[in-house]
Amino acid sequence: AKIYTRWFFDLAKSGGPRVNYQAVGSGSGRKAFIDQTVNFGASDDPMKDKDIAKVTRGLVQIPMVGGTIAFGYNYDCDLKLSQEKAVQVAMGMIKDWKELGCKPGKLTWTHRSDGSGTTKAFTNSMEAFSKTWTLGTGKSVKWPAGVGAKGNSGVAGVIQNTPGAIGYVNQSYIKGNVKAAALQNLSGEYVKPTVEAGAKALNGITLDE
């Protein structure tokens, strides 16, 4: 959402039209587009045939930008997560930071409470990481534990204000007390969600036609 806010700010500043863009989550945004209460939307999760069929005015989907999703956390630890440990954290199975090689302390899992393309992408990864993951994939899932918050900003806010909290957010929300964990990739290396790492990953994908 931040990049669209910046683009539309620059557009208005240069004499162009003013665009009212609101980050409401992919679930709400998709419904608003289908109901024709907005002119366009953006999501990390492209619309599928079932929803496209509901758009009577027609639909064009354009790949715009790519980004990374981070495990953001607020704790005194240089956190490195294996794929298995990442899944266990997100499943609410890990309650203490010592289980992740950090000093002992309460771990609080934080997740999205609204329908979210970020959640869809995140759960896709969790399912690919380990058979331990049993929540399926989607814009929303039934989290067995943790604190829910609306939007990337909401999750980042909980982490920022809760020592010992960890959750998933877009890379652009990694700031202040919210640090990014290094996550194990397919090669076994531990990588942080930087612009460079994200660009390298995006160069290796093939977009659907």
Question: Positions of the model-derived regions?
Answer:
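Exported/periplasmic ABC-transporter solute-binding proteins
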Residues: 1-209
